């Protein structure tokens, strides 16, 4: 049984209902006996009457929650004195839960006006003790509707109600001489049987509902042309506030349903209607429906080449695993010889990116894992390579189940993992007009310690000197490390025992405040040295413990100008590894492939398409009326981007139909202008309720994994005051 809302009122005759549907383009057929009509004319009178004492928005928001397929009615009780009089005249109708003494007095066949005991009992009697739920003049419209949805009879002491007809509990003489309104289409006389909701395949009514199962709103209706002002007011409110929740349906689909034909589905809203009705349909997917998170990868065969005195020598044969094909194409990598070092001895950006995107390297002779030595000083260094082939091409899913919600990402990498270098490379990559990973979207856990006075690493250094009984940093290093730079186990254990309370008492409290603030500023990528850092700071984002195919300790030794020098950083690296949990690390490439590869795939699909039809943003929407209350100009609604999306046009049309408004947050808009263009102010957001599920975005669309919360300003007017707002997600696209 489905309910179809049409913004018009007709008589309850079936022929009139069919005529109403046909006026909207529905081919209902002459003998459509399974279509019935719910006459909501009485609701218009109730709506008009309710607007005298309640806010229009509150009444409409309540009425939109009415389940029109559930039979319910208000039962209007007489005033207390008249109710007792009615019971005295009709003892058989006295409810069982009435006070026994009062019942006994009412059943006496005498005048009770001078009966002191009766008068005392009557004064103590409360109607609400007998009838529940009970509607009164102070009851909110939403409570009225909730009670109607939960039961068939809702008792009331007032006729100022909404959503159902009013049945008189007693004969008309027991009520006041005049009710507030006496239209027969709203009031059901005492003793008259109440008509129930007809059990037809299709019920046609005036008012849409988000509580009615299988409720649809006829699409293509011009709201401004609705002649009845109250119906127009209702639809305007519903379309502006609840548009993402209601289901549109085309006249074509209604025609097919009524005439029991196979559904001809053309739009996303029609598809959803067919799914809600559990009816068979067929949609031919176009070439645009491509899972961009399925990525082709290969294993790259390479040789380490040494050239001495003009002679070429292959010192090692390696296999680089799970390298995305799209990255090889982007970098132009083919079978050839390559120099992978710059003049200063550092790796080239392309080689660093290629290795970081892989799942490590294997020595083809020993079949053991091979870690690259970052040093440019022999022995066992790589200066030149020769790529000799590509094998084992297959497809992987770069969006694993761990990414269930759109949340911040915490990436745990050991010290010396080229974080600064790889972030510089990612910051330079822009695909389809979207920066893949802007540097402003990255937070480093080192920032927590650097905010302390003295810094966390300096405090650790001074305490460790006391433990070792030395005065200088050099003596501390000699005490901890042997000549091969391997730590003495017992001495490193002593330092670790001192490190734990420092991390708990100094680092963790500061980190909690830092991450609370940073995560309210955006969905940021957070780097840390140990997962325990984030766990102890109550970090709620995706937590990934990662590794890279490089010897990180060697990279630490070649980095200069760090707190305490290279050797002290090496000691800290050992301590952070001890501080980490026992969780098995994944390759850093598993995260980088998710960041880059779907976008390269999408670029092939929509590279030549109009950006206006393939771009969208999902963000927190603030009505301009609320902004104007805090001094903003109100030139447009406030919008704080949360997710940027690129997808083919057909996929965009499907995304546009989804219910984004069910996700909400408290948003704080500041008056602090952000440097740069376009003109914008910084903002903060705290998610309320559930986070946005990744699956809602669709596997046929690319979305940004990070975001910085900012509200764009389209005008040059002065900013308003900083304030907090309750905002919901909204879909914004040039298609809308």
Curated annotation (Swiss-Prot):
GO terms for cellular component: host cell cytoplasm; host cytoskeleton; viral capsid. Its cofactor is a divalent metal cation. One of its GO terms (biological process) is symbiont-mediated suppression of host JAK-STAT cascade via inhibition of host IRF9 activity. Keywords: Capsid protein, Host cytoplasm, Host cytoskeleton, Host-virus interaction, Inhibition of host innate immune response by virus, Inhibition of host interferon signaling pathway by virus, Inhibition of host IRF9 by virus, Interferon antiviral system evasion, Viral immunoevasion, Virion. It is found in: Virion; Host cytoplasm, Host cytoskeleton. InterPro entries: Reovirus_Mu2 (IPR012494). Coiled coil: none annotated. Pfam families: Reovirus_Mu2. One of its GO terms (molecular function) is structural molecule activity. Changing residue 415 to A: Loss of ATPase activity. No effect on microtubules association. Changing residue 419 to A: Loss of ATPase activity. No effect on microtubules association. Interacts with protein mu-NS; in viral inclusions. Interacts with polymerase lambda-3; this interaction stimulates the ATPase activity of mu-2. Belongs to the orthoreovirus mu-2 protein family. Minor inner capsid (core) component. Displays NTPase and RNA 5'-triphosphatase (RTPase) activities. ATP is the preferred substrate for hydrolysis. May function as a cofactor of polymerase lambda-3. Associates with microtubules and plays a role in the formation, structural organization and morphology of viral inclusions, where the assembly of cores and the replication of viral RNA occur. Together with mu-NS, recruits the other core proteins to these inclusions. This is Microtubule-associated protein mu-2. It comes from Reovirus type 1 (strain Lang).
């Amino acid at each position: 049984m489905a309910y179809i809302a049409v913004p018009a009122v007709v008589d309850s005759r079936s022929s009139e209902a069919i005529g109403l549907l046909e006026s909207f383009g529905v081919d209902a057929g002459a003998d459509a006996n399974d279509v019935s009509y719910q006459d909501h004319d009485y609701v218009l009178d109730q709506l008009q009457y309710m607007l005298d004492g309640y806010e229009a928005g509150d009444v409409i928001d309540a009425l939109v929650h009415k389940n029109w397929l559930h039979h319910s009615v208000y039962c209007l009780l007489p005033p207390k004195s008249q109710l007792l009089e009615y019971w005295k005249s009709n003892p058989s109708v006295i409810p069982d839960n009435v006070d026994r003494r009062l019942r006994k007095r009412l059943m006496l066949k005498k005048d009770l006006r001078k009966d002191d005991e009766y008068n005392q009992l009557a004064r103590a009697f409360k109607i609400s003790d007998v009838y529940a739920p009970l509607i009164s003049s102070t009851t909110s419209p939403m409570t009225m509707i909730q009670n109607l949805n939960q039961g068939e009879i809702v008792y009331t002491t007032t006729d100022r109600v909404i959503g159902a007809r009013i049945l008189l509990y007693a004969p008309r003489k027991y009520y006041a001489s005049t009710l507030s309104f006496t239209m027969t289409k709203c009031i059901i006389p005492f003793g008259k049987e109440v008509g129930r909701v007809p059990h037809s395949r299709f019920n046609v009514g005036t008012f849409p509902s988000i509580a009615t199962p299988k409720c649809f709103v006829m699409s293509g209706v011009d709201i401004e042309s609705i002649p009845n002002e109250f119906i127009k007011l209702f639809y305007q409110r519903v379309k502006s506030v609840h548009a993402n929740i209601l289901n549109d349906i085309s006249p074509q689909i209604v025609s097919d349903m009524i005439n029991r034909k196979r559904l001809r589905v053309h739009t996303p809203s029609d598809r959803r209607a067919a799914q809600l009705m559990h009816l068979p349909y067929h949609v031919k997917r176009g070439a645009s429906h491509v899972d961009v998170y399925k990525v082709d990868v290969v294993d790259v065969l390479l040789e380490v080449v040494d050239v001495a005195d003009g002679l070429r020598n292959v010192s090692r044969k390696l296999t680089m695993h799970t390298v995305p094909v799209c990255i090889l194409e982007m970098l132009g990598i083919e079978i050839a010889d390559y120099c992978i070092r710059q003049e200063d001895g550092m790796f080239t950006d392309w080689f660093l990116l290629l290795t970081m995107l892989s799942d490590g390297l294997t020595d083809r002779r020993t079949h053991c894992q091979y870690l690259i030595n970052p040093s440019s000083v022999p022995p066992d260094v790589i200066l030149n390579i020769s790529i000799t082939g590509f094998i084992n091409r297959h497809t992987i899913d770069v969006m694993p189940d761990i990414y269930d919600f759109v949340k911040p990402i915490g990436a745990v990498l050991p010290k010396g993992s080229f974080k600064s270098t790889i972030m510089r490379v990612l910051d330079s990559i822009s695909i389809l007009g979207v920066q893949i990973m802007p540097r402003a979207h990255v937070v480093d856990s080192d920032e927590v310690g650097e905010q302390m006075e003295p810094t966390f690493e300096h405090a650790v250094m001074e305490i460790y000197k006391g433990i070792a009984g030395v005065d200088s940093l050099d003596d501390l290093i000699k005490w901890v490390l042997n000549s091969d730079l391997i730590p003495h186990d017992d001495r490193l254990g002593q330092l670790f025992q001192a490190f734990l309370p420092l991390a708990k008492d100094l680092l963790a409290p500061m980190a909690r405040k830092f991450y609370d603030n940073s995560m309210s500023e955006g969905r940021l990528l957070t780097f840390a040295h140990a997962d325990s850092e984030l766990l102890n700071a109550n970090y709620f984002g995706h937590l990934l413990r990662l590794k890279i195919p490089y010897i990180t300790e060697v990279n630490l030794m070649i980095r200069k100008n760090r707190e305490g020098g290279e050797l002290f950083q090496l000691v800290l690296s050992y301590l952070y590894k001890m501080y980490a949990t026992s969780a098995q690390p994944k390759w850093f490439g598993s995260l980088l492939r998710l960041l880059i590869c779907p976008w390269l795939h999408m670029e092939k699909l929509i590279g030549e398409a109009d950006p206006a039809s393939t771009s969208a943003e999902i963000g927190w929407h603030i009505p301009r009326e609320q902004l104007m209350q805090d001094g903003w100009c109100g030139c447009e609604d406030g919008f704080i981007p949360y997710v940027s999306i690129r997808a083919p046009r057909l996929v965009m049309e499907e995304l546009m139909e989804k219910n984004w408004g069910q996700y909400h947050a408290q948003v704080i808009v500041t008056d602090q202008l952000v440097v740069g263009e376009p003109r914008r102010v910084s903002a903060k957001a705290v998610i309320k309720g559930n986070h946005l599920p990744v699956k809602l975005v669709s596997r046929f669309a690319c979305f940004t994994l990070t975001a910085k919360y900012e509200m764009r300003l389209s005008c040059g007017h002065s900013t308003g005051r900083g304030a907090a707002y309750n905002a919901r997600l909204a879909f914004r696209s040039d298609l809308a």
